[in-house]
Amino acid sequence: MSYVPVVIEQTSRGERAYDIYSRLLKERIIFVCSTVEDHMANLIVAQLLFLEAENPKKDIYMYINSPGGVVTAGLAIYDTMQFIKPKVATLCIGQACSMGSLLLCGGEHGMRYSLPHSRIMIHQPSGGYKGQATDIEIHARETLKIKRLLNELYSKHTKQELKYIEKSMERDNFMSSEEAKKFGLVDNIISSRDTIAFLAQ
């Protein structure tokens, strides 16, 4: 089990201990920093809904360092980001690959950021199915439907032509922060908090 730091906060009622992620959640910061799968997606969705209930008019900040993962789990997070009232700013720290890159570009337009040395990767969904030929055919058709859906979502958020997206996602397509900005996955590259403060003006 990985160690999670604990923060001690002094209050008028005494000391209170938070794990570091819970403390940052108080500041409306959510971390997507692992493989995207059902359990973690449920936790991220719950945090988004909680912060909306706390204040539907205040922005949420999502920090992403993820290699990607399960498409349906990623879409659960993505759909919730679009569903809730607060704007969701996204920031890539380290990497945003596969479904991680969709979450990155699915943030509020103008509020999608990357640190200078982050890596972003897009690609088509993959499937490895076993069983009867008919079942494999069913899963293959579903994978093609998911592929079309993802291409349409990337096209929507990057403002790129669908045909260009389809070509770009045929194989693993790694990008630097600058390349991701040119592609339309992020809006700005930031190296300090001063940069964010300037862009927010």
Curated annotation (Swiss-Prot):
Cellular compartment(s): Cytoplasm
GO cellular component, one term: endopeptidase Clp complex
Reactions catalysed: Hydrolysis of proteins to small peptides in the presence of ATP and magnesium. alpha-casein is the usual test substrate. In the absence of ATP, only oligopeptides shorter than five residues are hydrolyzed (such as succinyl-Leu-Tyr-|-NHMec, and Leu-Tyr-Leu-|-Tyr-Trp, in which cleavage of the -Tyr-|-Leu- and -Tyr-|-Trp bonds also occurs)
EC number: 3.4.21.92
Catalytic residues, chain numbering: 98, 123
UniProt keyword annotations, A-Z: Cytoplasm, Hydrolase, Protease, Serine protease
GO molecular function: ATP-dependent peptidase activity; ATPase binding; serine-type endopeptidase activity
Gene Ontology biological process terms in this record: protein quality control for misfolded or incompletely synthesized proteins
EC main group: hydrolase
PROSITE patterns: CLP_PROTEASE_HIS (PS00382), CLP_PROTEASE_SER (PS00381)
Keyword Protease: yes
Transcription regulation recorded as keyword: no
Pfam families for the chain: CLP_protease (PF00574)
PANTHER family given in the database record: ATP-DEPENDENT CLP PROTEASE PROTEOLYTIC SUBUNIT
Subunit and interaction comment: Fourteen ClpP subunits assemble into 2 heptameric rings which stack back to back to give a disk-like structure with a central cavity, resembling the structure of eukaryotic proteasomes.
Family from the record: Belongs to the peptidase S14 family.
Function: Cleaves peptides in various proteins in a process that requires ATP hydrolysis. Has a chymotrypsin-like activity. Plays a major role in the degradation of misfolded proteins.
Name recorded for this polypeptide: ATP-dependent Clp protease proteolytic subunit
Species, as recorded: Rickettsia prowazekii (strain Madrid E)
